[in-house]
Amino acid sequence: MALDTASKSQIVNDFQRAQGDTGSPEVQVALLTARINGLTGHFKANAKDHHSRRGLLKMVSQRRKLLDYLKGKNADSYRNLIERLGLRK
């Protein structure tokens, strides 16, 4: 579901490259991950909500594209980000 302002600003502060950075791939991936984690809990209670599932799949795809971009541009930042977010097992 949607993130509240406080949690969104906390995520931005944790992952921004410089003060005022809200659009870097690291910040975008962190925000998408928080939204994906929230929706994953939603599907435990609402298994037949296929409309929201499509939105979840679009978010996962967008996150994957951003991670692929980041991996090509800055591999060290990519590895650091997936470790901090716990995306790879």
UniProtKB/Swiss-Prot annotation:
Function statement: One of the primary rRNA binding proteins, it binds directly to 16S rRNA where it helps nucleate assembly of the platform of the 30S subunit by binding and bridging several RNA helices of the 16S rRNA. Forms an intersubunit bridge (bridge B4) with the 23S rRNA of the 50S subunit in the ribosome.
UniProt-listed GO biological process terms: translation
Of which family is this protein a member?
Answer: Belongs to the universal ribosomal protein uS15 family.
Kindly give the NCBIfam families that the UniProt entry links to this protein: S15_bact
Gene behind the chain: rpsO
Q: Which HAMAP family match?
A: Ribosomal_uS15_B
Q: What is this protein called?
A: Small ribosomal subunit protein uS15
* Assembly and interaction partners: Part of the 30S ribosomal subunit. Forms a bridge to the 50S subunit in the 70S ribosome, contacting the 23S rRNA.
| GO molecular function annotations of the record | rRNA binding; structural constituent of ribosome
Q: Which SUPFAM superfamilies match?
A: S15/NS1 RNA-binding domain
Q: Which GO terms describe its cellular component?
A: cytosolic small ribosomal subunit
Superkingdom of source: Bacteria
Keyword list (alphabetical) reads: Ribonucleoprotein, Ribosomal protein, RNA-binding, rRNA-binding
Cited SMART domains: Ribosomal_S15
UniProt xrefs under InterPro entries: Ribosomal_uS15 (IPR000589), Ribosomal_uS15_bac-type (IPR005290), uS15_NS1_RNA-bd_sf (IPR009068)
Give a single Pfam family match. Ribosomal_S15
